[in-house]
């Protein structure tokens, strides 16, 4: 979740949750088994993130000391973490992929996300069946 940038794992107190998410994302996305697969990244709990950054500076977290700021700025914080996830990719091609900043309790937002997900699945299926060119 986007809001977990200042939290540690319950099972490994020294491991930052966002760092763990970045490492897992990198591992999955750069696996050859997924080389022809579109990527959908959901950065959830944007509502909690928006509240949390008012009191918990991103740059104050050791793994994210390079956050340029400004502090307490929702959009800058979101863009910073989106870039962190993009930086995990060996192949910089994010054309057929989508990043969604979500709040699961926001029905309008989730409706848009589900529509985008359907589009990704249909596009991948059309590509695999030969109706669309390869990436």
Segments (PLM) and residue ranges:
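Conserved GTP-binding G-domain of TRAFAC-class P-loop NTPases and closely related GTPase folds
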Residues: 2-135
């Amino acid at each position: 979740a986007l809001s977990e940038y200042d939290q540690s794992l319950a099972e490994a107190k020294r491991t930052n949750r966002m760092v763990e998410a970045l490492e897992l994302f990198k591992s999955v996305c750069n696996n050859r088994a997924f080389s022809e697969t579109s990527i959908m990244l959901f950065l959830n709990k944007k509502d909690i993130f928006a509240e949390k950054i008012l009191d918990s500076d991103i740059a104050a977290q050791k793994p994210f000391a390079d956050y340029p700021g400004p502090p307490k700025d929702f959009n800058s914080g979101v863009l910073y973490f989106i870039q962190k996830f993009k930086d995990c990719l060996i192949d910089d091609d994010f054309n057929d992929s989508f990043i969604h900043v979500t709040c699961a309790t926001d029905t309008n937002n989730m409706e848009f996300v589900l529509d985008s997900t359907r589009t990704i699945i249909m596009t991948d299926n059309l590509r695999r069946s030969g109706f669309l060119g390869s990436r």
